[in-house]
Structures are given as C-alpha cells and as structure tokens.
C-alpha cells in the first residue's frame, strides 16, 4: 500500500492511496481461501470448492470487503504515521470509473482512492490567573422564607362557602366551568369543569381572574383575554373568550403558620420547615450564580483563545443550531422579518454561535484532558438515572439505549466533564464576589441560560 500526501493546508489533509494489483490479488485470494474452508456448495465436498469457482460466485462481494479493509488500514496508517488527531470521520473518494474497479478485481490494474480529513487544531494553553471573573451572589432574605411559608399556608388553608348571593372577592376560591373559544370556535385544552381557582393567585391567564371577581354562584360571564406572547405556540398572542359559570364561592379561613402547618407537610417543627426552605432557596441562588459566572468565564475564554476551527465541525454545529431555529419558528409561527432581522443576518449570527460552541468545546476538552479530569462511571450512572426518570414507564428502555450506544452516552458524560473543567479553571482565575439582589441574580442567570452553551460541542 502506497500513501502519498497531496494536500496540507491549514487543518485540511488529503492523501492518495494506491493498492498495487498484486496486493489486491493477494488480499482477495486470502479471503477466498478462508471462505473455502467454511462455505458449503452442492456438488463439492467441504473445503474442496475451487477458489476460481468461489471467485465467480462471491468475488465481487469479497472485493468490497477487501476495499473496506484497505480503507480502514489506510486511515490507521495515515493517522499513526503522521501523528494526526482527526476532527471527524475521513472522507473517502474512489478514483476512476466502474471499469477501473473491474480491472482491479481482475488484478490487472492498481486500485486507488483518496482520503480527505480535517485535523484538530493545536494551541497552547497557559495559566488562567489573568482571567478575572465577577461572581454574583445573593443572601437568602427572611422575607422570602416567610413568603414561601405563606404559600404553603395558603395551600393548607380551609375555605368556607360564602353566604347565598355573595359575590366573589379577591382571595376567594371559586369553583367554575369554562369553555374557551378563539374566533368563536372552541379550542383544544380550553375547557374545564369543576375547576378550583383562588382569585389573585395568578394561576390562570393574565386578566382572567380579575374578571371573575364580583360573580355570584350561578352567574355566567364571557371573559375576554389575550394569551401571552410566550405561551404555547398555537395560542401565543391570540385573543380568546371564555364562557365562565360560577358553581361555588368560598371564603378563605384564617392562615396559620405554626408547627401544625409544618407537620401537615411532613416536618416535625416549623423551624425545621423553615430551615429546609432556606436550604432550597440557597441551592436555587447557588445554581443561578453558577450559571452567571460560568457564562462570564466562557466569555473570557472565548476572547482569550482564538484559533483555526475545523470547517466540518462548524458546519455540523451550525446545522444543529439552525434546525432548532427552524423548529422554533414553526412552533411560534413567526418570520425573521417579524423578529426584526433577515434570514441572511440570522444565519450569520447563528454561525458565530456555532463557531463559539466549537471553539469552547475544543478548548475545554483540551484543558480537561491536560488537567487529567475524568468523569467517574458512577457519576455518569447517576446522571443517566436522572435522565431515565424523565420518561416514566420507559426507564429501562432509556437506560438500555444509552448503555448500548457509546456516542449517546457521551451526551450524558459531556456536560459533567464540562462542569468539572470549568470548576478547575475557576480555582485558578481571579474571582470577585459581588452581592446583588435576588431579582438581579436570577435575571443574569436567565440571560446565561438563554445563551448558547458550549457543552454540546464538548467531547472527553
């Protein structure tokens, strides 16, 4: 096998591979000899079928095996001898026409093909002491604990029917039937019977509860509302009416926050319940803080490290990103013009996102590898269990799918690897904690979550 480099440009490499006719004949004969010992053909004793006869019957299918074996061998040879790290699967192009393949099969001509691939970029990784990160943190205010306690107390609060003829007030619990319509026609999921609604809880569409206030048992009213723009795609932004019938109006009893309330929710004391609420809020703030500083860290890494990217990886990432854009548009029904842009401009913006994700993915993979970061199997297993739990009744199927598909399992491992890597970088960066309000922290976290993550482009 003769391998000659024909292109070395940036991250692109191309090679011409020639398999001499004699080599083809030898490989073909070797496989036919192996087949001879196994095949059973009427009229011939086991192991006595002439090789020439086998070649007439199976030669072309065996030739395909020979070619595949040669391709695999060439790929290994190219990567090992040139110490290359491929950025994806090599592309194989066969030279010549069908007649050339036939000549190779008859061992009267050499067999040639091309191998084209992109390699991973090489870049130097220094220390991270020059990276400065502002980390937002927030204290858990006692009023937030009390607010959540109040919500639990509301859930546990008793309601007593109001006197006959009494109108519903804010804070009352009403039992209603309703039929929702758009353009005068009922829509799927827009109707309900014997639905309990606490007026002022903001659990229904904005404007709905306010229009129920003042109604009495037995009264009907047509309520007009507009679905929020961020509602489900088929209903977002649409005007609707609801024909509402009030069946019961109940006034709230006294709200009690004591040990009995705590016991109703499985706690021994009110203080134990408060402590759990504080812990839950603290965990929520910590997760929000992490999202904020992680985004800031990735931004700094993206600015600090610039290197050539494999076009194939960028194209694949862009295709993934763009498919999501198209699906989002299908769900929302919005066009680029309605969003204040054009398809051309949107493509340019999302290509930058794809480039960022590939760059950060390659960078974090390299940093993690050099730092010796590994994700233990038990951590992957725990994450896989959590993923399976998201599909009740299909847990075993989900578990088996990931366990039998290493590429799919890497989708579970990659985010864990990324988190460990950014934690490692953070230990070396300059971090300044800044106390902010809950609202500011959650806003920053939401902005970070809405931005494009690196994790999908990361591989360990």
UniProtKB/Swiss-Prot annotation:
Localisation per UniProt entry: Cytoplasm
NCBIfam families xref list: tig
Keywords: Cell cycle, Cell division, Chaperone, Cytoplasm, Isomerase, Rotamase
Family from the record: Belongs to the FKBP-type PPIase family. Tig subfamily.
EC number(s) from the headed UniProt entry: 5.2.1.8
Free-text comment on this protein's domains from its UniProt entry: Consists of 3 domains; the N-terminus binds the ribosome, the middle domain has PPIase activity, while the C-terminus has intrinsic chaperone activity on its own.
GO terms for MF: peptidyl-prolyl cis-trans isomerase activity; protein folding chaperone; ribosome binding
GO biological process: 'de novo' cotranslational protein folding; cell division; chaperone-mediated protein folding; protein transport; protein unfolding
Catalytic activity: [protein]-peptidylproline (omega=180) = [protein]-peptidylproline (omega=0)
Function: Involved in protein export. Acts as a chaperone by maintaining the newly synthesized protein in an open conformation. Functions as a peptidyl-prolyl cis-trans isomerase.
InterPro entries cross-referenced by the UniProt entry: PPIase_dom_sf, PPIase_FKBP_dom, Trig_fac, Trigger_fac_C, Trigger_fac_C_sf, Trigger_fac_ribosome-bd_bac, Trigger_fac_ribosome-bd_sf, Trigger_fact/SurA_dom_sf
Gene3D superfamilies on file: 3.10.50.40, Trigger factor ribosome-binding domain, Trigger factor, C-terminal domain
Any one GO CC term of the record: cytoplasm
Name of the protein in its database record: Trigger factor
Pfam family, one: Trigger_C
Keyword Protease attached: no
Domain PPIase FKBP-type positions: 171-255
Gene assigned in the entry: tig
């Amino acid at each position: 096998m003769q391998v000659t480099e024909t292109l070395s440009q940036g991250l692109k490499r191309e090679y011409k591979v020639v398999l001499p006719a004699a080599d083809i004949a030898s490989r073909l004969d070797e496989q036919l000899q192996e087949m001879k010992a196994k095949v059973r053909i009427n009229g011939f004793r086991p192991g006595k079928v002439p090789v020439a006869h086998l070649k007439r019957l199976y030669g072309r299918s065996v030739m395909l095996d020979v070619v595949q074996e040669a391709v695999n061998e060439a790929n290994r040879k190219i990567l090992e001898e040139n110490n290359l790290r491929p950025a994806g699967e090599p592309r194989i192009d066969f030279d010549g026409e069908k007649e050339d393949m036939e000549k190779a099969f008859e061992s009267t001509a050499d067999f040639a093909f091309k191998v084209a691939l992109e390699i991973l970029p090489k870049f130097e990784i220094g220390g991270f002491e020059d990276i400065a990160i502002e980390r937002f943190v927030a204290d858990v205010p006692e009023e937030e604990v009390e607010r959540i306690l109040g919500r639990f107390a509301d859930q546990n609060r008793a309601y007593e029917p109001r006197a006959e003829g009494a109108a519903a007030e804010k804070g009352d619990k009403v039992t209603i039937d309703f039929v929702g319509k758009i353009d005068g026609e009922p829509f799927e999921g827009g109707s309900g019977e014997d639905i309990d609604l606490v007026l002022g809880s903001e659990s229904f569409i904005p404007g709905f509860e306010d229009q129920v206030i003042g109604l009495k048992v037995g009264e009907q009213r047509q309520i007009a509302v507009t679905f929020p723009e961020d509602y489900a795609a088929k209903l977002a932004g649409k005007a609707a009416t609801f024909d509402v019938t009030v069946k019961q109006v109940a006034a709230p009893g006294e709200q009690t926050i004591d040990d009995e309330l705590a016991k109703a929710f499985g706690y021994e004391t009110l203080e134990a319940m408060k402590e759990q609420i504080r812990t839950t809020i603290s965990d929520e703030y910590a997760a929000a803080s992490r999202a904020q500083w992680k985004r800031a860290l990735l931004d700094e890494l993206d600015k600090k490290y610039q290197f050539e990217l494999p076009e194939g990886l960028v194209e694949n990432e862009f295709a993934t990103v763009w498919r999501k854009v198209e699906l989002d548009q299908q769900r929302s029904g919005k066009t680029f013009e309605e969003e204040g842009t054009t398809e051309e401009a949107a493509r340019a913006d999302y290509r930058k996102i794809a480039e960022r994700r590939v760059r950060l993915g390659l960078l974090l993979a390299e940093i993690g590898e050099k730092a010796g970061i590994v994700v233990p199997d038990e951590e992957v297993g725990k994450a896989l269990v959590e993923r399976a739990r998201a599909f009740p009744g299909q847990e075993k199927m989900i578990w088996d799918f990931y366990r039998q598909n290493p590429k799919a399992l890497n989708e579970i491992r990659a985010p864990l690897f990324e988190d460990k890597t950014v934690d490692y970088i953070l230990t070396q960066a300059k971090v300044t904690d800044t106390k902010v309000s809950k609202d500011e922290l959650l806003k920053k976290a939401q902005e970070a979550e809405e931005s494009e993550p690196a994790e999908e482009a990361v591989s360990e």
